[in-house]
Swiss-Prot record:
Gene: folE
PROSITE patterns, alphabetized: GTP_CYCLOHYDROL_1_1, GTP_CYCLOHYDROL_1_2
Gene Ontology process terms (BP): one-carbon metabolic process; tetrahydrobiopterin biosynthetic process; tetrahydrofolate biosynthetic process
Organism name: Thermodesulfovibrio yellowstonii (strain ATCC 51303 / DSM 11347 / YP87)
Protein name in UniProt: GTP cyclohydrolase 1
Family in the record: Belongs to the GTP cyclohydrolase I family.
Length: 188
């Protein structure tokens, strides 16, 4: 569980540390707001409300399933600044499929914690392999990191792309290429 009081105290200390008047009307309730926000954006640190990636057994579909351009946000664990973008998730079933909303739900759960994009990408692919036992999967995540956009090197709009490739997507260049072409295809 989250310790809301400890979060509020910490935020108050940070505000004092940067020279803010913690009793100023616009700032006074900020520690409470931040504590509530942390409970929401870090929900993935708690056990999931439901079983992730509930599968439907006995399906005979054995061709690629791809959901692309799934928007997400997360928080970089190094600077506690957001990173956000789109995920693309492909898998080839082996007797099990999931309802299409299950993949974005899994992404949302795993992204709601202090995180790095590389780990998020791998965690999603590993979860897919563990729960669905598909012939293979591929996860590609494209994201902008505010820790690069608004501080440090200050390069807004720079995108970081990570991938995790498992099973047949790793073994077969043709399968991997098909997924990449579908991900990169833009409807006119």
């Amino acid at each position: 569980m989250f310790d809301r009081k400890k979060i509020e105290e910490g935020v108050r200390l940070i505000l004092e540390g940067i020279g803010e008047d913690v009793e100023r009307p616009g700032i006074k309730d900020t520690p409470i707001r931040i504590a509530r926000m942390f409970e929401e954006i870090f929900r993935g640190l708690l056990p999931p409300d439901e079983d992730l990636l509930k599968s439907i057994e006995g399906e005979t579909h054995d061709e690629m399933v791809l959901i692309k351009d799934i928007p997400f946000y997360s928080v970089c664990e190094h600077h506690l600044l957001p990173f956000f973008g789109n995920a693309h998730i492909a898998y080839i079933p082996d007797g099990r499929i999931v309802g299409l909303s299950e993949l974005p739900k899994a992404l949302d759960y795993l992204s709601k914690r202090p995180q790095v994009q590389e780990r998020l990408t791998s965690q999603l692919a590993n979860l897919l392999m563990e729960k669905l036992k598909p012939k293979g999967c591929m996860v590609v995540i494209e994201a902008e990191h505010l820790c690069m956009s608004m501080r440090g090197i200050k390069k807004p709009d720079a995108k970081t792309i990570t991938s995790a490739v498992r099973g047949i997507f790793r073994k077969s260049q043709t399968t991997r290429q098909e997924a990449l072409e579908l991900i990169n295809r833009r409807d006119k």
